[in-house]
């Protein structure tokens, strides 16, 4: 599927590495009012055998991929039994609106499918209309509300599901 992102730059999606954490933490701080800590990511990458994290690296169209292209976005998922639970998705503000979030979500869904997953679930802030629109365009449906889910402001989260 072609996206605007691929018209301006190419995107490679691959597993997150420990050396990506500095860039990931910057994206995290720019994206969320209560960002995850370095320790939280280290715990996910090193200790959680159900966790999978992907990064998107962008580079100019038609150019060979640089050896050290920096991450411009990332997504995480837990695979529990046959269900993928999206833990987080974020794209650097300079790269938003180019389809990178969609590319990451599609890659996460592919990963879950390859590992035998049958469905996906996630929570999204009630006020995050951009993310809700993306998830609906990917086939996610609202399945309920988690009241006061987000600790920073007690905001509700919509629960969304999708069969793969």
Task: Outline where the language-model segments fall.
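Acetyl-CoA-dependent GNAT
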Residues: 2-7, 15-98, 105-115, 163-164
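Conserved SAM-binding loop
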Residues: 13, 97, 123-124, 142
């Amino acid at each position: 599927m072609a996206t605007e992102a691929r018209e301006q730059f190419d995107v490679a999606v691959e597993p997150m590495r420990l050396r990506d954490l500095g860039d990931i933490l910057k994206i995290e701080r720019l994206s969320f009012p209560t960002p995850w800590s370095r320790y939280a990511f280290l715990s996910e990458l090193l200790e959680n055998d159900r966790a999978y994290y992907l990064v998107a690296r962008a580079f100019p169209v038609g150019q060979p991929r640089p050896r050290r292209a920096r991450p411009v976005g990332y997504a995480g998922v837990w695979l529990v039994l046959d269900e993928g639970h999206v833990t987080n998705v974020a794209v650097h503000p300079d790269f938003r609106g180019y389809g990178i979030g969609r590319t990451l979500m599609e890659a996460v869904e592919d990963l879950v499918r390859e590992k035998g997953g049958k469905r996906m679930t996630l929570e999204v802030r009630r006020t995050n209309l951009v993310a809700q629109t993306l998830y609906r365009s990917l086939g996610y449906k609202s399945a309920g509300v988690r009241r006061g889910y987000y600790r920073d402001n007690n905001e509700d989260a919509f629960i969304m599901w999708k069969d793969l």
